Amino acid sequence: MSGIPSEDTLLHNSGPSRRFCVAPMMDWTTSHYRYLARQLSRHTLLYTEMVTTGALIHGDTARFLRHDEAEYPLALQLGGSDAGELAHCARLAQQYGFDEVNLNVGCPSDRVQNNMIGACLMGHPDKVAEGVRAMIEATELPVTVKHRIGIDGRESWDDLCEFVEKVSEAGCRTFIVHARIAILEGLSPKENREVPPLKYDWVYRLKAKYPHLEIIINGGIKTFDECHEHLRHTDGVMLGREAYHNPWLLAGVDPEFFGEAAPVETRHQALRAMLPFIGSELERGVFLTHMSRHLLGLFHGQPGGRQFRRYISENAHKSGAGLEVIE
């Protein structure tokens, strides 16, 4: 199997720059966090939390897909395995203005496994290929896949290559690879981010073997020096928890990786830039704590940073708490 997409497919799957991305993270990469991230970097590609196809089709679609245009470029991550449902949701992604639609084939949670969502799908590459093909036919957006390097029982190099080849033959050009296997039984999602060893060299080998594919590396990346090393071997980097707990890191992305000045020069400037958005959300009935929790790491490692965290944590949840807590 060559796995070489046609020229039309390559064009179809280009989309936004993925040189530097922030990973989709449940409960963390909400619209409120993404708005903060965008005050710090104009070019970082942001991802939503995973949304299941069932939630989008049978739930409050508008609520799940709500975002601010200021968040662009923005990708929607879907969880699901039914080709028809994935196609329907890919159309919704385009309708709501997203820049990319991404399929989750990396989450190891028991809850999603039972619904054939996430990392368990690495054991069913034909099903993933079917879903990807349906999504590509349903939308003009680039369709990408985020996955592990394997799962227990299917963790060989040949297994990984079979997965990538089958999914690329379905038309997927971009693979975001978490450089660990997922152990589907016996480990929690948190343990699955820490216990299986990182094998960055496997991701490098994927890019070397399939140079026509766009390979983005993910897993345990924390510093710009590490990013530059990975970019010697891959097309892009994706950071997760480091970009959440230390969001000011993102203020260095545009000058470091895109040759442009950062949108803000100081943390205080970033905080002030958030105030109109927070105010409008408060008027919409959103509780302050739903937004302020994403600000807690903004002064990470700075003098007064702990006091800032403590003050926000102790006051944002109080009844009637408003902008005065942040200001």
Predicted regions located by residue number:
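Alpha/beta catalytic cores of nucleotide-metabolism and tRNA/nucleoside-modifying enzymes
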Residues: M1-P16, F20-C21, M26, H32, ...
